Regions:
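Membrane-helix boundary/helix-loop-helix interface segments in multi-pass membrane proteins
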Residues: 1-21, 27-30, 35-160, 333-347, ...
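Hydrophobic alpha-helical transmembrane segments
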Residues: 54-62, 282-299
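Transmembrane alpha-helix boundary/anchor motif
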Residues: 61, 69, 126, 199, ...
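Hydrophobic alpha-helical segments of polytopic membrane proteins
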Residues: 79-80, 86, 142-157, 163-211
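Hydrophobic, glycine- and aromatic-enriched re-entrant/interface helices and adjoining loop segments
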Residues: 99, 105, 191-287, 312-313
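Alpha-helical transmembrane segments of multi-pass membrane proteins, especially transporters
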Residues: 117, 142-147, 190, 316-324
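Interfacial segments of multi-pass membrane proteins
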Residues: 131, 172-186, 261-287, 345-360
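Loop-to-helix entry and N-terminal half of a specific, functionally important transmembrane alpha helix
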Residues: 304-344, 350
Length: 398
């Protein structure tokens, strides 16, 4: 164990969660990509397994590198990395690849990049930096407006093609502002405005002639909402959720066993959007509870890191990333069991998808880097005193 901790620094429980999610993902992706392999790779069922394994290995390497990077790098580079993400998001709107009727990825060096995955990570780091720097000005309306402006700049290009991701980003950002002690009346005003806009959007969506908007995602959004509310026709969204619920219901307590899923043959994208349903079908309620517990544990370990931190920036970073990752996971699970409308959100570190794996690995690497830094900081405090910690706080806010 001591040798492990010397190599893999930071919170050992977070490392355990990483390895658990990665292992479950490899098994689930291999089981759920059979049809895809026969339709795209002439029956080579190992193709997607090996590709997914390759991304996992690269992701773990990236995670290891990131968790060893000096912590001040995150603070100083956050604004530049966020602006790069924003530029790529707007580029995607014009030259992005069309996947499932949405332009979400762009080609870079022979690979496809989903900038929204990148933006989710770097926005959290930027918000943590800005909130920690402005702790004495959190009651200032200008501080709130600047934060909100940057958040809207990120989600504006995401909304047309990936509304569910935009909602995850907005929810996480709002929670971070609450934790960062932004004035309550500003938060309530934001929530009130959000509810009003959502009501207006729903009214327009239900009453507009969708034939005029076939080139947009609006017909898809309308169908998914109608399916969820039980007022729509028998659509693809309805079919997806029915098949997903069948998978969950037939899994029982112990599951059908690895590789024995039947609903993978009927579910669209069982290796990404509905991978939780396949996991529950094959590994039962026990497997589902294991995954749920892993993400709950992630939040609890993040809270532990926060309580141990004597500085606001690292505390906000680790909690923001943990909440964002877990919230996305719980939304994915809610869709799979029919409690939420179809969103297209993947299960972090489990679903197939190279960009998602890499940027989730970066996110976990940052969390591990924070916990490693706090461990070292506690040791420094015991030998050099609190003054050095106060000096580091000033360095974070530069």
């Amino acid at each position: 164990m001591n040798k492990f901790r010397k190599i893999f620094k930071g919170d050992p429980f977070i490392w355990g969660i990483v390895f658990l999610l990665s292992a479950i993902g490899v098994l689930a992706v291999y089981s759920s990509t059979g049809n895809l392999a026969y339709s795209k790779q002439e029956g080579n069922t190992e193709f997607y397994l090996l590709r997914h394994l390759g991304f996992i290995v690269v992701g773990l390497f990236v995670m290891y590198v990131v968790h060893n990077i000096p912590f001040k790098f995150y603070s100083r580079s956050s604004i530049y990395l966020l602006w790069l993400s924003i530029v790529l998001l707007f580029v995607t709107l014009f030259v992005g690849y069309n996947i499932n009727n949405a332009q979400r990825v762009i080609p870079i060096f022979g690979f496809t990049l989903q900038p929204s995955d990148m933006a989710k990570v770097f926005l959290v780091i930027f918000l943590a930096k800005y909130l920690s720097k402005k702790q004495q000005e959190v009651d200032n309306l200008q501080v709130f407006i600047r934060l909100l402006g940057m958040i809207l700049l990120v989600i504006a290009p995401i909304i047309p093609e990936n509304l569910s991701t935009a909602l995850v980003v907005m929810t996480t950002s709002t929670l971070l502002m609450v934790i960062g002690r932004i004035k309550t009346k500003f938060i309530l005003g934001l929530l009130g405005t959000g509810v009003l806009l959502a009501a207006m959007f729903y009214f327009l969506l239900m009453n507009l002639d969708m034939n005029k908007y076939q080139h947009t995602r609006m017909p898809t959004w309308k169908k998914r909402i109608e399916t969820y509310m039980g007022t729509g026709e028998n659509t693809d969204s309805n079919y997806q959720q029915v098949q997903s619920q069948i998978a969950v219901a037939t899994g029982g307590f112990w599951g059908k066993g690895p590789g024995n899923s039947t609903q993978r043959n009927y579910l669209p994208h069982p290796y990404s959007d509905f991978i939780f349903a396949i996991i529950v079908e094959e590994y039962g309620l026990l497997g589902g509870l294991l995954l749920i517990s892993a993400f709950i544990l992630l939040i609890l370990r993040a809270l532990k890191v926060v309580l141990e931190s004597q500085r606001s920036f690292p505390a906000l970073v680790v909690l923001g990333i943990a909440v964002s990752t877990s919230f996305q996971a719980f939304v994915h699970m809610g869709v799979s069991v029919g409690k939420l409308p179809v969103t297209g959100l993947t299960l972090p570190l489990v679903s197939m998808g190279g960009t998602s794996i890499i940027f989730n690995s970066i996110a976990f690497g940052v969390m591990l880097g924070v916990s490693r830094h706090i461990q070292e900081e506690k040791l420094k405090a015991s030998t050099t005193g609190v003054g050095s910690i106060q000096k580091d706080e000033e360095e974070d806010n530069k």
